[in-house]
Amino acid sequence: WGTYIYNYGRPQGRNFLIANALFWAKEYHVDGLRMDAVASMLYLDYGKKNGEWVANMYGGNENLDAVAFFKQLNAVYKKKNRTSMLIAEESTAWPMVTGDIKDGSLGFDYKWNMGWMNDFLDFMSADPLFRKGRYGELTFSMIYAYSEDFILVISHDEVVHGKCSMINKMPEADISEKFADLRTAYGFMYTHPGKKLLFMGQDFGQFNEWWEKKSLDWDELSKEYNQKLHRYMKDLNVLYKKEPALYELDYNPEGFEWINNISADECIVSYVRRAKNGDELLVVVSFTPVLREKYKIGVPKAGHYKEIFNSNAKKYGGTGKLNSRVKVSQESECDNRKDSIYITIPPLGMCIFRHVDEETVTADEIEIPEIVDTKITKSENVPKAEKVKAKKKEMPGEINKETQKDSKIEKQKKKETQRETKKETQ
């Protein structure tokens, strides 16, 4: 930010910076250090015009001295502080920022996922009615999710200088929908692969932007919606720590599987998070203010599915429309899976299901599945039996049109037969 750049090729400069990092760990016992604007150090031409920088010995724009410095810093720091984290705020596609130095990486433990943050906040700031046009911003992050060890970050940078607090990024005018949308955003963030960083004040929905010259607006915790969001975040953190499926395989493709990432019109995503021991959680998230009942969704395996978390619970400020009964899957294809269940998806909501053993569920807890047409398509999302019932309600006392049509055809055939018989007789 207009400051001088260190000469990373000189031992005096490297020694000063490394000693500074070690001081924070030794004297202040910090849990970790974040390196700000790493890209400005890695590139010789960062923020410079043509003629203002000199290429490296290979003719490129990479700052080779800075690369060597990062490797030395991370190696020395980790040798003395094995449990302390080193995090890079790196906004470009520089390869191997995280990982083992022996493999050629810079040696950081984690990298801020700036791509996810920009895409996700852009998506969430859009009116829910138009989010389907930005649906790709929701799903794109999984294409590169395993290229680095990422942290999903909503930092101080996103809630200052006119960018609005998180609650005010939500576009709804209605206060209840605004908080519901924010709960959904955090629910998606916590179930998406990657570690989490959420800046202070955003956990209880502070309306004002953060300002370094004053404290947080703690008085807002006396308001109902802020209190309930605060409780939601507390319970979400408890759930996160309790469920290894949400964090154990963040950087392994085995830990995540899409169920449906193509429902742009409905703005719904569903996916599975998986633990090392094979335990699975089914996550369904809706980003529109539409209540969807009897919504058909494919499941990874047949059996019983119990809802263990729902952002729409009344204690969190929701309407209380939940999946209170255990869902039993049916052999009915959906989302390219042979088994499926019907669930209720709350408006602007996130729900999590666990596959449970039949022996652990009582008969009273189970929702008796309806007999449905196994050829039903995803777009219908309503059992055929239900459609027939609805049709009968709409037309009480009327004769079915198809039956009426068949009757007319039979009468016409009968008349033609009579004419032919009469001609033969004559």
Language-model regions, residue ranges each:
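Alpha-helical packing segments of well-folded alpha/beta enzyme cores
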Residues: 13-24, 69, 73, 185, ...
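Substrate-binding/active-site clefts of carbohydrate-active enzymes
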Residues: 1-62, 343
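Conserved alpha/beta catalytic core and glycan-binding cleft of carbohydrate-active enzymes
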Residues: 29-31, 46-212, 241-312, 319-320
